[in-house]
Amino acid sequence: MSAPTFRLCPADIGLEVAFAGRSNAGKSSAINALTNQRQLARSSKTPGRTQMINFFNVGDADRRLVDLPGYGYAAVPLEMKKEWQVELEEYLVSRSSLAGLVLMSDIRHPLKFFDEQMLRWAKDGELPVHILLTKADKLKYGASKNALLNTRKRLKELGLNCSIQLFSALRKEGLDELAGVMGNWYEYQLDADKIIESSFALLEGDELEDAIEQDALQKDSSQQDSK
C-alpha cells in the first residue's frame, strides 16, 4: 500500500465521525462545504489513488472528522482494492471511538454495490449511518425527490435503518441538516469554524515511508508473538 493503514490511526479515544464514499461521489466537496473552506479536504488528481486517512479536530482533540479514502474507482488495481476493503471493514467494525458514518452517494447513481457493502459493515458494527445523496443540483427537484424515495425503498429492502438527505455542495444545500446529525453524534454543537486539520494527517515523503515501514514491522511482530 502507498499510504498508512488504519493501524496508524491516532489513539482510539474520544468520538469520530467518518466520511466515506466512492471516489467520484463528492466527498471532498462535501467536507469543504461543511467547513466553509475550499481546500481542507484535498482531492487527488487521479481519483481513487489517494489512500491517506485525514483527521480533523472538531472543537477539541477528542472529537474528530475522519476523511476515509475513496473507493470503487475502476483504474485502481484489483489487489489494491482488496487491501482497501479489508482496511475499511476493520475500521468500521472495530473502531470504538467511531460514533457515526456519513456515506456519500451520487444521486444519479445511488447505492452502488460497494456502498451497500459499507452499509452492511456499519450494521455489523452497530454503527449509525447518515446518507448524503450528493450532487442534488444535477437533477431537477422532482427527479431528486424520486431518487430520495427510491433510495429509502432500497434501504428498507436491505433491512437497513439509515437517515438520508439530499445534498448539494455547490449550492450549499443540506448543510444544516448534516451539521445537526453530526452534532448529535459528537454530543456537541458543531461549529465549522473550529474544524482544523490535525498535524498527524500530514505524513508525506520519507516520513510517510517510515510510517508504512514501522506499521509492517509491528504487524510482523504481532504475528510472531501470536504463534
From Swiss-Prot:
The keyword Metal-binding applies. PROSITE patterns: G_ENGB (PS51706). GO terms for cellular component: cytosol. Residues 13-188 form the EngB-type G domain. GO terms for biological process: division septum assembly. GTP binds at residues 21-28, 48-52, 67-70, 134-137, 167-169. Its cofactor is Mg(2+). Coiled coil: none annotated. Keywords: Cell cycle, Cell division, GTP-binding, Magnesium, Metal-binding, Nucleotide-binding, Septation. InterPro entries: G_ENGB_dom (IPR030393), GTP-bd (IPR006073), GTP-bd_ribosome_bio_YsxC (IPR019987), P-loop_NTPase (IPR027417). It holds the Pfam family MMR_HSR1. Mg(2+) binds at residues 28, 50. It comes from the Bacteria. One of its GO terms (molecular function) is metal ion binding. The keyword Metal-binding applies. Belongs to the TRAFAC class TrmE-Era-EngA-EngB-Septin-like GTPase superfamily. EngB GTPase family. Necessary for normal cell division and for the maintenance of normal septation. This is Probable GTP-binding protein EngB. The gene is engB.
